[in-house]
């Protein structure tokens, strides 16, 4: 019974969203959905979210490997710091990034000497997405890597496999499902980021405007219909991408 009620928690808002949209004609819906500013925002948001998820997958894997396989001073601090983006409100995360990478920030002032700028650019959007979605890959991989049977590695070594061969043929295939899960979660989180992005990007249409900010701008203009259409489109695109990722993962697992 409880499960049935929990099912409606995500379904009811979606039902309300699509009900609001379908009150209008398909012509009006299509006009809002394929607006040049909206199309540019879809593409830019998805591209940045995919790059952020890929970056997090690579470096998240490396960090997970280090904190799981090695003992060193500061290990517990690093392990705890990984969860920092979970604890910070996104607006605080944006303010932190702006403080560090702004023209007068700790890092930004040195970048300015080389005529480099991060905030109010596309790279700033990417940086914000990476920051807020970084922990997902590490927390997805960590329990799997910690629970890995070391006997499998020892057996591979006894059979003459090198360390690289052992990693490639024994360890990595075991980690792939968790890595894909982390990638998917990281992508989903980056795709919907608003608080930090709105503070660190210029939010210019046809440039570095992401869909979450575009939706907010539409709501500020009392264009609830337009905001709903844009939200529904990016939702369906995200579901399609996640479906394709999960399908590829299932195909890999059956091999």
UniProtKB/Swiss-Prot annotation:
GO terms for molecular function: ABC-type sulfate transporter activity. Residues 42-246 form the ABC transmembrane type-1 domain. CDD domains: TM_PBP2 (cd06261). The chain crosses the membrane at residues 2-22, 48-68, 77-97, 118-138, 167-187, 195-215, 225-245. It is a multi-pass membrane protein. Keywords: Membrane, Plastid, Sulfate transport, Transmembrane, Transmembrane helix, Transport. InterPro entries: CysT_permease, MetI-like, MetI-like_sf, Sulph_transpt2. GO terms for cellular component: plasma membrane; plastid membrane. It is found in: Plastid membrane. Part of the ABC transporter complex cysAWTP (TC 3.A.1.6.1) involved in sulfate/thiosulfate import. Probably responsible for the translocation of the substrate across the membrane. Belongs to the binding-protein-dependent transport system permease family. CysTW subfamily. This is Probable sulfate transport system permease protein cysT. It comes from Prototheca wickerhamii.
